[in-house]
């Protein structure tokens, strides 16, 4: 068993892209934990729109000035990564009951592999319950208005990626 500090939390995800829901959860997590490592997953069964470097950069820019955080890529098993980083907690967000079953299974598997690493769930702020990176990308790909659902830098990158001009002041 490795040495871990329960005051350091890992918040993992693909963040393809980071949404205001993610940012809100990280801000709230900063009120609970001394430090949060925003761990951007490199190994994902999904086909990301943005490269790992783009996702890390967008998250770093969007979260600048938000508490004590580090944004970095990770590969491999999450619990192994958490242990290497000295984190005693994996932070996860829940939007709906449908999220819970999957997240509960992951938490149990992680606990089986590394009993000393806990999973803590935070409910998503009600303003962001309906958004996900997948829904954001679907709307943006069709020119939908996603302003206010993602950080400004992410908004610009999505508009550029899909070839739509973005309003500078709207």
From Swiss-Prot:
TM region(s), chain numbering: none
UniProt-listed Enzyme Commission number(s): 2.7.7.3
Pathway: Cofactor biosynthesis; coenzyme A biosynthesis; CoA from (R)-pantothenate: step 4/5
CDD domains: PPAT
GO MF annotation: an example: ATP binding
Similarity comment: Belongs to the bacterial CoaD family.
Any one Pfam family match given in the protein's UniProt record, by short name: CTP_transf_like
GO biological process, one term: coenzyme A biosynthetic process
SUPFAM superfamilies: Nucleotidylyl transferase
Binding site for ATP: 14-15, 22, 93-95, 103, 128-134
Protein name: Phosphopantetheine adenylyltransferase
This protein's UniProt keywords: ATP-binding, Coenzyme A biosynthesis, Cytoplasm, Magnesium, Nucleotide-binding, Nucleotidyltransferase, Transferase
Residue(s) at site: Transition state stabilizer: 22
Subcellular location: Cytoplasm
Source species, domain of life: Bacteria
Subunit structure: Homohexamer.
GO CC annotations, alphabetized: cytoplasm
Principal subcellular localisation of the protein: cytoplasm
